[in-house]
C-alpha cells in the first residue's frame, strides 16, 4: 500500500510541477460570417484545414451538455479526470459479451485530442490518464466541457459543435433543437461512421441517436421529448456568399462575425451584374463591381468585387472594391463643393468652357468641343473638363489634395506632383473611397468610414460645410428630362439621384457613383488587367447599370431634395446669362441658392446698356435722345465668343461704333484683356533666341491687343490670335493693352537653358 500511495504522491507532485496546459495552443479556429439578419455567408477553414468554430459554453444549449454527459460520462462532475467505475463498467460489458463501452471520461477524451495521443498503446493510455489529471487540476469543469465541445470530431474535417451545427443544420449551436442535439451527440464516439455527410452514415447516426433518445426519455422529462422522433432534416451546408466581402472580413478576425451586409440586396445586385455583363459581352464587357452603402449609418449593404469570383479568365478573385484606378471625372463634384464652400460659385454661376492653358498644362474636354460658357450645374452634370480644372486652380491643389487624404484616399505623392490633373482622374482611388466620399455629401459634409461589422463605432469628421455639401448634391440631383445630351433615355427612371459618371484615360474604366434615397451606390466596369475598350464610357455603360440597380432596390418614391432648416442658405434672383445679380436690363432671370456671407455675387458687368443710333443701328458715342435709344447687350470676352462660334451658337453681338469714340472715357468701361498665357508668376525655361507665345482674351468691344515687355512694344495681335516674340532673360513684366486703353499686367521669369 505504501508503494502505491507513494506512486500516487509522485504522480501528483509531477503533475503539480508541470506547467499549466494550454488547451488551445495547437489549434486555430475558423470564422463564421453572418449578414445583418443572421444569415450565414461563409465558414472559413482553420489553419490546419478544419472547420472548427469556437463557441462559448453559454452559447451551447443546456440540453446538449446534458446529452453529452448522459452518453459519454455520467460521472463527469464526480471524478478528477479518470473514472475507476468507468473502467470496471467497460470491463464487465466486454466480458459479458454486451456492447463495447469506452472507459474514457470527457476529460480523457479531451486530453487525447489536445495532445494528439495514440491511446491504443499502453504508454499512450498512461499519458492520457496523466494529462487528464493535469487538465482537471488546472481547469474547471465548465472550461473542460467548453474545450471538448470546441474540439470534438464531427466527421470529415468538421470539429466542434459550432461548425457542426452550421454545416449540418445551417444554424448556430444555440439554436439547436433536441433531435439535432441527439444527432450531433453520438458523432464524436465514431465520427467516421456516424457523421451526416451522406445517406449511409446518416442511417448509422439515426440508429445511435435512437439509443440515446431512449436513455434520454428515461432520464429527463423535457418539453421537446414529443418531437424526438420527428424526421431530421440535415445536409452539408457550406455557403460562400459575397466571397470578396467575407474574405476581407476573415482576413481581419475569426470567430462568429455579424456584419452589416444584407444578403437579399447582395444576391439581387450580384444577379444584376451577371445579367448586365452577359448582355454586353459582344462589346467586350465581362467584368463589373458594385458597392451599396446605407448613408444613415455607413453600413455596407452589398459588396460585389467582380462579376464572377470563380472565373479566372476575368481575374474574378481580384477585389474590385479595394483596387485603385483612375476615377475619370467622378471626383469633380468635390472640386465644386470646395468652390461652393469658398464662395467662388453658386449653382448658376457662369463658367467658361473655352480652350485654356494653365502654365504648360492644356486640358481638353472629352468630346474635344467647347460650350463657350455655361452655368456651374450644367458644367458639372455635363462633365466639362475646362471649368473643373479652372475651379481646381482657384480652390487650390493643396486644399483638394487634403480633402482626398482626409476622406481616406491613399496618396503617396505630393499635391504638386498630381497638380491640376487631379480634376480629371490624375489620382487613383478605390470604389470604397468613392462610396465614402459620395456619402459625405448626403451626410452634410461629414466624413465617416464605411462600416463592415455590426458593432463598428465610427468617428465623424466635418470636411465640407453642410451648405456646400447640400448644394453639390442639389446640383447633381436634377430632373432627368432637364439634362441635355444624355446618352440614353433616362426619362423613364422613377427616382431622382445625385449621380456622376467617370471615364478613365484610354477607356480602361467606366464609373458611376451617386446618391438616391438613403443609399450611396458606386458601380464600375472594366478589366483588371488594364486593357482598354472603347465601350468603357461612364455615361454610356456604367450609368445604365447604376439605374438598373437603383430601380430594383429603391422604393420608387419622389426624391425631391428639400433644404434642411438649419442650413445658412437663401435664394437670390440672378441674371441667367451671366450668373450675376439681376439688373433691370437682364433679358432672362432665374433664382438660385447662395450662402449668405460666403458666396460672392456681383452686379453684372457682362450685360450692359449702350446707346444705339436709331437711324443706322450702330453704337453711338453718347446717349442723345431722341436720336438714340438704350439697348441691352452681353459683352463676352473674345475667347468665349470664339467658342460660341465654333459651337455654332448664334450670339447677338454689340454693333460697331458710329464714329471714333476711343477718346471718350465713358466707353473705356468693361473688362481689360485677360492674359491667358503665360500664367502670372510662372517660370519659363527657354533656349537662346527661342520665342514664347503671348495670348489674351479681350472684351467683346475690343479688336486689337498691344503687347509690351518691360514697357517696350513687342507687337500687336487681333482678338483670338497669338503673338510670338523673343523675350529677354530674367524677371520681366508683360502688359496687354486693348484698343480702348484697358490693360492688364503679369510678371514672369525667363530662365536660360542650353
What spans do the regions from the language model cover?
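Short pre-catalytic segments that frame enzyme active sites
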Residues: 32, 39-53, 163, 190, ...
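Active/ligand-binding-proximal structured segments within catalytic/core domains
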Residues: 59-92, 317-337
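Soluble, non-transmembrane domains of envelope/secretory-pathway proteins that act on or interact
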Residues: 1, 12, 34, 220, ...
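A penicillin-recognizing enzyme superfamily signal
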Residues: 259-282, 292-294, 303, 311-320, ...
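Residue-level preference for non-acidic, small/hydrophobic
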Residues: 38, 68, 110, 144, ...
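Conserved catalytic neighborhood of penicillin-recognizing serine enzymes
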Residues: 93-120, 236-240, 244-248, 296, ...
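Non-catalytic, structured segments within soluble enzyme domains
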Residues: 12-13, 99, 103-267, 271, ...
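N-terminal type II signal-anchor transmembrane helix
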Residues: 1-36
